[in-house]
Amino acid sequence: MKKHNILFVSTDDKINIDISKQLENIFGEFCNIDNLVYVNRINIELSSYELVVCSDNDIKEYIHNNIDKNIPIVIVHRTINIENINKIISIENDSDVMVIDAYKESADETAKIIRKLGLININLIPYYPGCDKSKCEIGIITGSRNSIPQNIKQIIDIGDKVIDINTVIEIFTKLNISIDK
């Protein structure tokens, strides 16, 4: 069986490694997966790829505007690993809790995911380097401990975010891969 070729592009080394591993675990049987960290521009020929998966809309726009308008692109959406929800539920109601990440977009995304769960009544405050919101004592992180403010006394690590099932289905669909074997 001929494998499909996928390129994953992100702006962050850690995200690139994490998502590439997840893509390999899910699609490795059907696809060859390459990855690339986007800094200021992409110097790669995309014609050998059937699909580009990227970490955000800025990368998608860059590819469509500067490289190839016709290549199919999927933006990867991530969610919290269901195994770690109990860590969030254990937070006392009405607590102020920082959602800490190295990037604003990722901190906002994690806070949004937690709110969508609707399981708890806490005040989530996205935090990333450069913002001035350091009054909380509880912080939620998704694996990385690089951006934790000094005033945080309790760290709740909910692990790396995982690829959302809707993204998985979209990739299978774009590549015309039947999910049932």
Regions found by a protein language model. Give the residues of each.
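Short acidic/histidine-rich motifs immediately flanking catalytic phosphotransfer sites
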Residues: E45-V52, S134-I138
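Ser/Thr/Gly-rich flexible loops in soluble cytosolic domains mediating phosphotransfer, phosphorylation
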Residues: K2-F27, V39-I42, N57-I113, K153-K181
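Structured core of small recognition/catalytic domains
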Residues: K135-I138, T142-G143, I148-I165
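N-terminal beta-strand-loop-alpha-helix module at the start
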Residues: N35-S47
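Short beta-strand elements in bilobed, periplasmic/extracellular small-molecule ligand-binding domains
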Residues: F27-V37, L117-Y127
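A structural micro-motif
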Residues: C31, E50, I71-P72, I120-I122, ...
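Short, polar loop motifs at secondary-structure junctions
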Residues: Y38-R41, S55-E61, K104, P126-G130, ...
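Ligand-binding grooves and catalytic loops that recognize ribose/phosphate and carbohydrate rings
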Residues: S134, S144, K174-S178
